[in-house]
Amino acid sequence: MTAPVNPDGPPDAEIICLGEAPGKEEAEESRPFVGPSGRLLYDQILARAGIRREHTLALYTHWEMPSGRKWETISNLGKYDESTLKTIGAHPRKVIIAIGEHALSFLMQGSAKTAGRLEIVKWRGSMLTSNRFAANVQAALAFTGSAPTIAVPMIHPESVMRSGEYDEAGIGDDSGADRKGLHYRSLCEHDAKRIKQIVEGKIETPPERQVMHAGNCSYSAIDMALENLLNENGNTPIAFDIETFSHTITCIGVASSGTDAVVVPLTEVSWTRSQQVKLIDRIADVLDGPAPKIGQHLDYDVQHLARIGIPVRNVWLDTAVAHSILHPEIPHDLAMLTSLYTLEPYFKNMREDKEVDEPIYGAQHWRYNGLDCCVTWEVGMNLDWEMRQ
């Protein structure tokens, strides 16, 4: 058993760098993040964003080097939970950088000893407010009158190093790095810039996104919202998205801003057939109208809509295609684009986390569809701006 590596940095630092467990160099020097991955983190990724080590408090969820340097070999996981929570909660914090999936899981599940881990590649870059943390983590951070602490998950620098050649000198020679290595590093640098903006107060929490659907609105309210969309200026872009189950459309969503969406379920049992037909006609008129349309991999949606007689006119921008032109080295799925071009935290787990007895066409399914529309609209507008620069 090795000696514990204690936290390092100002006890009242506004930024916490929460790692997983120390490596060989950290154990030898009894200081966090001094090995190759720590140097990559502090000397390059955070330094380029203007974040200096002396302004952060660095610590781990497990303070001892694992046997064989593998997390799976730790027999006393959870041993340092109380010490970690006490350290984090000793002073108000602006940002906790959760470095790697074990650090993220600690914040969200409340212990280093967790049954399942959250996938860091999915959650990285998300602005997670403290009300989403585990109850014991929230309690540790509870300061009367202080602003909520934000956590930003980041891919572990060791993953950057493993996925491609690592240029420790920082001279920019990435000729030997594979595609994953390049985009992992780009994502870490993007997230570091976001963290700096949070600390400086330049960005705040994500906007509230309102999704109208059959679970929270009456039929007449949805009908009126669609009519208002039809009456809007035809120059305002409209994002659209569908959800399918077994090759059948379950709902159709539209949004004319990043904060408001309307979802028409095709499976709502409380509506009469004539009401269902009217709303489908309404949304068909919206999609066939003159407004520019935004979609994500929209060929899929357009083909499914065509099968039920809904045309999509004036297609303006496919967010996946636009992003592939601008940044071919980075994946182009909507979760990735959401993390890069909006402040919306990762929400794709809504498809996986629905209640067992909730049908595929329930309220969570509809809200998920509406969020897709809102973020697609926001991503599309930001990509359009970027392409024009």
Placement of each model-derived feature along the sequence:
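Short hydrophobic beta-strand that contains or immediately precedes a catalytic carboxylate
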Residues: I16-L18, I238-D241, G295, W316-L317
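Short acidic, glycine-rich loop/turn motifs
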Residues: R132, A142-T144, V254-G258, D357
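Short conserved beta-strand segments at catalytic cores or DNA/RNA-binding microdomains
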Residues: E20, A49, D241, C251-T259
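DnaQ-like (DEDDh/DEDDy) 3′-5′ exonuclease domain used for proofreading
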Residues: P11-A13, C188-I238, S246
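Short glycine-rich phosphate-binding loop at a beta-alpha junction
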Residues: K94-I99, A239, A291-D299
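Short, basic/hydrophobic alpha-helical segments
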Residues: D81-P92, A225-L229, S274-P290
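Active-site-proximal helix-loop-helix substrate-binding element of RNase H-like nuclease domains
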Residues: P148-V152, P157-M161, D167-G170, D174, ...
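A polyanion-binding, active-site-adjacent surface
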Residues: M1-V199
